[in-house]
Design a protein with these regions (language model features):
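GST-like domain detector, emphasizing the conserved glutathione-binding G-site
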Residues: 2-14, 18, 22-200
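C-terminal helix/juxtamembrane-tail motif
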Residues: 301-310
Length: 310
C-alpha cells in the first residue's frame, strides 16, 4: 500500500508517464463493449479458484486484497482513470493503481466484472469500507468527496452547502456526459475507426468546440467578476470599455467554475483537456480562458503526480 497521498502503480510493460503518449498506443474504445455471459464468468471464476497455477494477477489480487486504502483500476490511456487518480491525490488518500492490460483482456476477468459489470475502467475498491466497489468516474468522485466530508467535516474539493453541491455536480456531470464522450468519439473516428468518416470527425470535433464554448463563457464571466471585485481602482474604466480587462493585473489570476477554489467541477476536466490537441483543438488560441484554467490546474503537485501515474 502506498504512503499517504501517493500512488504505487501496477501494470504490465514500461509505464507511460504521458497520458497523450499513451493514447497513441492504445485504442480508447478497447474498453470493449462485449456482451457478458454471467454463467460463463462464474464458471471461469470457479475454475481459476480450483486451479492456482492458472490464476491471473487479477485473481491473485482479489484473493489477497489489502486491508486499508483504495485500489484504483485504470489504464495508461484512459483519461477517466487519471481523473479519479487526481481526486485521490488531491485528497491525500492512500491508493494503489492497477493498470489493466487490455491486450490480455484483464478488463473482462471474471473478478473484475463482479465489481464493474460494464467491464471498463475506472473502478475503485474502498478496502476500509468492507471492500466496497464503485464504478463510473463520476460516481467514484462523488463517493470520495462525500465520504471525505463525512469523516472530516469539510472537503476542499466539495462543499457542505446543498446549493453549492448541486452547482459543482452540474459541472461534473456536464464533463462526464458531454465533454469526455465527445472527445472520445472524435479521437475514435480520427484515429481508430476501420474506415475514414470525415462527417463523424467533423460532427464530434464541432461538438467538442461547442462544449468548450460553454466553459469559455462561464470562465470569462468569472474572470470579469473577479477583476471588477479586486481591481476597484480601474473598475469604472473596465465598465465603460475604455480599458480592456486584459490590462488588469488579475487577468491571469486563477478562476474556478464554482466558488473561489478548485473543486471536482474543475479538476474532472484536466485529463481530457490534456489530450484535446490530438483532435486539432488548440486551447491556447481558441479558448484562452479554458487554457489558463487548465494550466493553473496542471501546475498543482497532486495533478502532476496523478498524471505521471506516480
Amino acid at each position: 500500500m502506498s504512503s499517504s497521498g501517493q500512488n504505487r502503480n501496477s501494470g504490465s510493460g514500461n509505464p507511460i508517464s504521458n497520458l497523450s503518449a499513451g493514447l497513441k498506443q492504445v485504442n480508447l474504445n478497447d474498453q470493449q463493449q462485449n456482451e457478458v455471459n454471467l454463467n460463463l464468468l462464474q464458471q471461469q471464476l470457479q475454475n481459476e479458484t480450483n486451479n492456482p497455477k492458472s490464476q491471473s494477477r487479477i485473481t491473485h489480487f482479489f484473493q489477497n486484497q489489502p486491508s486499508e486504502g483504495y485500489t484504483l483500476f485504470s489504464h495508461r490511456s484512459a483519461p477517466n482513470g487519471f481523473k479519479v487518480a487526481i481526486i485521490l491525490s488531491e485528497l491525500n488518500l492512500n491508493f494503489n493503481t492497477i493498470f489493466l492490460d487490455f491486450n490480455n483482456g484483464e478488463q473482462r476477468a471474471p473478478e473484475f466484472v463482479t465489481i464493474n459489470p460494464n467491464a471498463r475502467v475506472p473502478a475503485l475498491i474502498d478496502h476500509q469500507n468492507e471492500n466496497t466497489s464503485i464504478w463510473e468516474s463520476g460516481a467514484i468522485i462523488l463517493y470520495l468527496v462525500s465520504k471525505y466530508l463525512k469523516e472530516n467535516g469539510e472537503c476542499p474539493l466539495w462543499s457542505d452547502n446543498l446549493i453549492e453541491q448541486s452547482q459543482i455536480a452540474s459541472w461534473l456531470f456536464f464533463q462526464t456526459s458531454g465533454h469526455a464522450p465527445m472527445i472520445g468519439q472524435a479521437l475514435h473516428f480520427r484515429y481508430f475507426h476501420s474506415c475514414s468518416v470525415p462527417s463523424a470527425v467533423e460532427r464530434y470535433t464541432d461538438e467538442v468546440r461547442r462544449v468548450y464554448g460553454v466553459l469559455e463563457m462561464a470562465l470569462a464571466e468569472r474572470r470579469e467578476a473577479l477583476i471588477m471585485d479586486l481591481d476597484v481602482d480601474n473598475a469604472a474604466a473596465y465598465s465603460a470599455g475604455t480599458t480592456p480587462l486584459s490590462q488588469s493585473r488579475y487577468f491571469d489570476y486563477p478562476v474556478w467554475l464554482i466558488g473561489d477554489r478548485a473543486t471536482v467541477a474543475d479538476l474532472s476536466f484536466v485529463p481530457w483537456n490534456n489530450v484535446v490537441d490530438r483532435i486539432g483543438i488548440n486551447l491556447k488560441n481558441e479558448f484562452p480562458e479554458v487554457y489558463k484554467w487548465t494550466k493553473h490546474m496542471m501546475r498543482r503537485q497532486a495533478v502532476i503526480r496523478a498524471l505521471r501515474g506516480d
